[in-house]
From Swiss-Prot:
Keywords of the record: Amino-acid biosynthesis, Histidine biosynthesis, Hydrolase, Methionine biosynthesis, Multifunctional enzyme, NADP, One-carbon metabolism, Oxidoreductase, Purine biosynthesis
Keyword Acetylation among UniProt keywords: no
Annotated catalysed reactions: (6R)-5,10-methylene-5,6,7,8-tetrahydrofolate + NADP(+) = (6R)-5,10-methenyltetrahydrofolate + NADPH; (6R)-5,10-methenyltetrahydrofolate + H2O = (6R)-10-formyltetrahydrofolate + H(+)
Family annotation (Pfam families): THF_DHG_CYH (PF00763), THF_DHG_CYH_C (PF02882)
Biological function: Catalyzes the oxidation of 5,10-methylenetetrahydrofolate to 5,10-methenyltetrahydrofolate and then the hydrolysis of 5,10-methenyltetrahydrofolate to 10-formyltetrahydrofolate.
InterPro entries, alphabetized: Aminoacid_DH-like_N_sf (IPR046346), NAD(P)-bd_dom_sf (IPR036291), THF_DH/CycHdrlase (IPR000672), THF_DH/CycHdrlase_cat_dom (IPR020630), THF_DH/CycHdrlase_CS (IPR020867), THF_DH/CycHdrlase_NAD-bd_dom (IPR020631)
Protein's UniProt name: Bifunctional protein FolD
This protein's encoding gene: folD
One cellular-component annotation, GO: cytosol
One Gene Ontology MF term: methylenetetrahydrofolate dehydrogenase (NADP+) activity
Superkingdom: Bacteria
Oligomeric form and interacting partners: Homodimer.
GO biological process, one term: tetrahydrofolate interconversion
Length: 282
């Protein structure tokens, strides 16, 4: 069994990104700029934002975190986003989710300039992605594909099951696997006979948001298991959707939590910010 080390791969890719960024600054005078808007004081969101800021600075980017209270009005938040849309120094705009109940997530995502939507959630970018002309790709699935590439995991002709159907992970993950010539099934919490279905998969991507949902009985011998889950157990410990200790006994490759998919998500956000900066100069 091989542990897929997303943390180490992220460090490797971000070192290469820092070199590209230095060359871009030297040759074209361009510095990628990433702004992250944090609404309120959600502890988990603050950790994610801090990690994004740290990665942006390590890559040589211009980085800013804008913290606003959770009492901010929807219109004021939209005005703030528009200010960064109009500022050419910023190439990536992220609004950290979740948002307070009085603010429409859909309106906020629509407000971000598609050219600066490095999360890849704007309908314009989603449409380009689904039609086979991707510009911004949701970063978690993109990071998982980089893992497959780094570890030389063959996808062509393989049976892949994605457990989870969100627009952020499940659906785009399935599309990327299809594009790599895997045969793909999407399952979810209401799928019948899910363990039986899962045991047929060569590649298992789990993004269902339930701690230790996938046990050994879901996994056939030699399967590749990618755990996207980020949950807390009763002791506050970070755990994945996969019961790592027992599934690692049967999997050929597996991602840990933490240190698996999470670091790669942030790495791909940085890559897409860099690419957005390069495109802005054309």
């Amino acid at each position: 069994m091989t542990v897929i080390d997303g943390k180490a791969l992220g460090v490797k890719l971000q070192a290469a990104l820092a070199e590209k960024t230095a060359r871009l600054k030297e040759e074209k005078g361009l510095v990628p700029g990433l702004v992250v808007i944090l609404v309120g004081e959600n502890p988990a969101s603050q950790v994610y934002v801090r990690n994004k800021e740290r990665s942006a600075l390590a890559a040589g980017f211009k980085s800013e975190v804008v913290r606003v209270p959770d009492t901010i009005s929807e219109s004021d938040l939209l005005d703030l986003i528009e200010r960064y849309n109009q500022d050419d120094e910023w190439h990536g705009i992220l609004v950290q989710l979740p948002l307070p109940a009085h603010i429409s997530e859909e309106k906020v995502l629509l407000a971000i300039d598609p050219d600066k939507d490095v999360d890849g959630f704007h309908p314009t970018n989603m449409g380009k992605f689904w039609s086979g002309h991707p510009v911004m790709i949701p970063s978690t699935p993109a990071g998982i594909m980089e893992m497959f590439k780094e570890y030389q995991i063959e996808l062509e002709g393989k049976s892949a099951l994605v457990i989870g159907r969100s627009n952020i992970v499940g659906k785009p993950m399935a599309q990327l696997l299809l594009d790599a010539d895997a045969t793909v099934t999407i399952a979810h919490s209401r799928t019948k006979n899910l363990p039986d279905l899962a045991r047929q998969a060569d590649i298992l991507v789990v993004a269902i948001g339930r701690g230790h949902f996938v046990t050994k009985e879901f996994v056939k011998l030699g399967a590749v298991v990618i755990d996207v889950g980020m949950n807390r157990d009763e002791n506050g410990k970070l755990i994945g959707d996969v019961k790592y200790d027992e599934v690692s006994e049967v999997a050929s490759y597996i991602t840990p939590v933490p240190g698996g998919v999470g670091p790669m998500t942030i790495t791909m956000l940085m890559e897409q910010t860099y690419e957005a900066c390069v495109r802005s100069a054309k």
